[in-house]
Protein backbone atom coordinates (compact mmCIF):
# COMPACT_ATOMS: atom_id res chain seq x y z
CA UNK A 1 0.00 0.00 0.00
CA UNK A 2 1.32 3.44 -0.88
CA UNK A 3 0.96 5.94 1.97
CA UNK A 4 1.87 9.60 2.35
CA UNK A 5 2.01 11.43 5.71
CA UNK A 6 1.39 15.10 6.47
CA UNK A 7 1.09 16.62 9.96
CA UNK A 8 0.27 13.30 11.63
CA UNK A 9 -2.33 12.31 9.04
CA UNK A 10 -1.91 9.53 6.48
CA UNK A 11 -3.33 9.19 3.00
CA UNK A 12 -3.59 6.15 0.76
CA UNK A 13 -2.20 6.96 -2.69
CA UNK A 14 -3.40 5.34 -5.91
CA UNK A 15 -3.22 6.07 -9.61
CA UNK A 16 -6.42 7.23 -11.34
CA UNK A 17 -6.22 6.31 -15.04
CA UNK A 18 -9.32 8.39 -15.86
CA UNK A 19 -7.59 11.63 -14.84
CA UNK A 20 -4.02 10.43 -15.47
CA UNK A 21 -3.14 11.64 -11.97
CA UNK A 22 -2.37 10.26 -8.56
CA UNK A 23 -5.22 10.32 -6.06
CA UNK A 24 -4.88 10.53 -2.31
CA UNK A 25 -7.54 9.68 0.24
CA UNK A 26 -6.91 10.90 3.79
CA UNK A 27 -7.41 8.07 6.26
CA UNK A 28 -9.03 8.09 9.70
CA UNK A 29 -11.20 11.17 9.21
CA UNK A 30 -14.77 11.58 10.40
CA UNK A 31 -15.65 12.55 6.81
CA UNK A 32 -14.16 12.20 3.36
CA UNK A 33 -11.24 14.20 1.98
CA UNK A 34 -9.28 13.42 -1.14
CA UNK A 35 -6.85 15.19 -3.44
CA UNK A 36 -5.08 14.80 -6.78
CA UNK A 37 -1.62 15.55 -8.14
CA UNK A 38 0.54 14.78 -11.16
CA UNK A 39 3.74 14.22 -9.18
CA UNK A 40 4.80 13.70 -5.55
CA UNK A 41 5.43 17.40 -4.84
CA UNK A 42 2.06 18.46 -6.24
CA UNK A 43 0.36 15.58 -4.45
CA UNK A 44 1.88 16.64 -1.10
CA UNK A 45 0.82 20.29 -1.65
CA UNK A 46 -2.72 19.19 -2.49
CA UNK A 47 -2.76 16.88 0.55
CA UNK A 48 -1.87 19.81 2.82
CA UNK A 49 -4.48 22.04 1.21
CA UNK A 50 -7.23 19.41 1.34
CA UNK A 51 -6.41 18.67 4.98
CA UNK A 52 -6.44 22.39 5.89
CA UNK A 53 -9.86 22.85 4.26
CA UNK A 54 -11.26 19.75 5.98
CA UNK A 55 -9.95 20.83 9.40
CA UNK A 56 -11.32 24.36 8.93
CA UNK A 57 -14.79 23.03 8.08
CA UNK A 58 -14.63 20.78 11.16
CA UNK A 59 -13.70 23.76 13.36
CA UNK A 60 -16.52 25.87 11.91
CA UNK A 61 -19.09 23.11 12.44
CA UNK A 62 -17.77 21.87 15.79
CA UNK A 63 -16.99 18.42 14.41
CA UNK A 64 -14.18 16.19 15.67
CA UNK A 65 -11.96 15.70 12.56
CA UNK A 66 -10.69 12.22 13.43
CA UNK A 67 -12.86 9.14 13.70
CA UNK A 68 -13.50 8.13 17.29
CA UNK A 69 -12.93 4.51 18.30
CA UNK A 70 -14.44 2.65 21.26
CA UNK A 71 -11.76 -0.03 21.47
CA UNK A 72 -14.30 -2.73 20.66
CA UNK A 73 -15.20 -4.50 17.42
CA UNK A 74 -16.82 -7.77 16.39
CA UNK A 75 -14.79 -10.37 14.57
CA UNK A 76 -16.37 -13.25 12.68
CA UNK A 77 -14.20 -16.33 12.34
CA UNK A 78 -14.86 -19.99 11.59
CA UNK A 79 -15.86 -22.04 14.68
CA UNK A 80 -12.80 -24.26 14.23
CA UNK A 81 -10.46 -21.27 14.42
CA UNK A 82 -12.35 -19.95 17.44
CA UNK A 83 -11.81 -23.29 19.17
CA UNK A 84 -8.09 -23.40 18.29
CA UNK A 85 -7.54 -19.85 19.52
CA UNK A 86 -9.42 -20.52 22.76
CA UNK A 87 -7.31 -23.60 23.43
CA UNK A 88 -4.11 -21.70 22.64
CA UNK A 89 -5.09 -18.84 24.94
CA UNK A 90 -5.90 -21.29 27.72
CA UNK A 91 -2.58 -23.09 27.21
CA UNK A 92 -0.76 -19.75 27.53
CA UNK A 93 -2.78 -18.77 30.61
CA UNK A 94 -4.33 -15.81 28.80
CA UNK A 95 -7.78 -14.71 27.84
CA UNK A 96 -8.84 -15.07 24.23
CA UNK A 97 -9.04 -11.27 24.10
CA UNK A 98 -5.41 -10.90 25.27
CA UNK A 99 -4.22 -13.46 22.72
CA UNK A 100 -6.09 -11.71 19.90
CA UNK A 101 -4.83 -8.29 21.00
CA UNK A 102 -1.21 -9.51 20.93
CA UNK A 103 -1.67 -11.07 17.49
CA UNK A 104 -3.21 -7.89 16.11
CA UNK A 105 -0.48 -5.72 17.65
CA UNK A 106 2.21 -7.98 16.19
CA UNK A 107 0.63 -7.65 12.74
CA UNK A 108 1.41 -3.92 12.86
CA UNK A 109 5.09 -4.44 13.69
Predicted regions and their residues:
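Short Lys/Arg-rich basic patches
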Residues: 60-76, 80, 90-94, 98
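N-terminal segment of the canonical double-stranded RNA-binding domain
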Residues: 1-21, 25, 49, 56
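Short glycine-enriched loop/turn motifs at secondary-structure junctions
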Residues: 27-30, 67-69
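Short, basic amphipathic alpha-helical segments that act as recognition/interaction helices
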Residues: 96-109
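A short, charged, amphipathic alpha-helix used as a generic interaction element across diverse proteins
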Residues: 39-53
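Generic structural detector for well-ordered beta-strands
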Residues: 12-14, 36, 74-76
Amino acid sequence: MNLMSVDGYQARISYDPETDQFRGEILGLSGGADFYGSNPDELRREFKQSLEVFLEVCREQGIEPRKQFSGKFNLRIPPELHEQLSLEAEAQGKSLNALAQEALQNSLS
